[in-house]
């Protein structure tokens, strides 16, 4: 599914809004994600840290787990916005790409050559990749059949 610029910008704004809920007292780096389901619903997520570090969760996985728990298991795109906790979202920070674990979790539910990963610095400044570009030669459910 090809997304129009307005749809991409809407996802970016929703991800920036989700970032405001991030709980990041240790890294002080807040991330928000907006995941577009095949049902056309948008599922949001933010990163949630923990003093023990490993129990924390990334924004992208929070959005995926929320969507799956609500019955959606097919996705079209995700927008990701990140930056230092004390900075406003959508200021010119660097692009925030999903970690390897998040890429693999997304891979479970999407066609990697068609799923759009939108990395945004601002509403106007963003990059769009397919998951396949970010996770080449990936392992997925079809490998277990």
Can you describe what each PLM-predicted range is?
Residues 28-36:
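Short beta-strand scaffold segments in enzyme catalytic cores
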Residues 58-80:
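Short, solvent-exposed cationic patches
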Residues 15, 33-34, 63, 67:
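Small-residue (primarily alanine) positions within well-ordered alpha-helices
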């Amino acid at each position: 599914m090809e997304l129009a610029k307005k749809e991409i910008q809407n996802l970016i704004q929703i991800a920036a809004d989700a970032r405001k809920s991030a709980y990041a007292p240790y890294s002080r780096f807040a991330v928000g994600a907006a995941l577009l389901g095949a049902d056309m619903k948008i599922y949001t997520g933010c990163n949630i840290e923990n003093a023990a570090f490993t129990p924390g969760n990334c924004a992208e996985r929070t959005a995926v787990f929320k969507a799956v728990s609500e019955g959606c298991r097919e996705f079209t795109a995700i927008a990701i916005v990140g930056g230092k906790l004390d900075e406003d979202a959508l200021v010119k920070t660097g692009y925030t790409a999903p970690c390897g674990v998040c890429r693999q979790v997304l891979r479970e539910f999407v066609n990697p050559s068609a799923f759009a990963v939108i990395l945004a610095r601002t509403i106007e400044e963003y990059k769009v990749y397919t998951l396949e570009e970010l996770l080449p030669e990936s392992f997925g459910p079809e490998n277990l059949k």
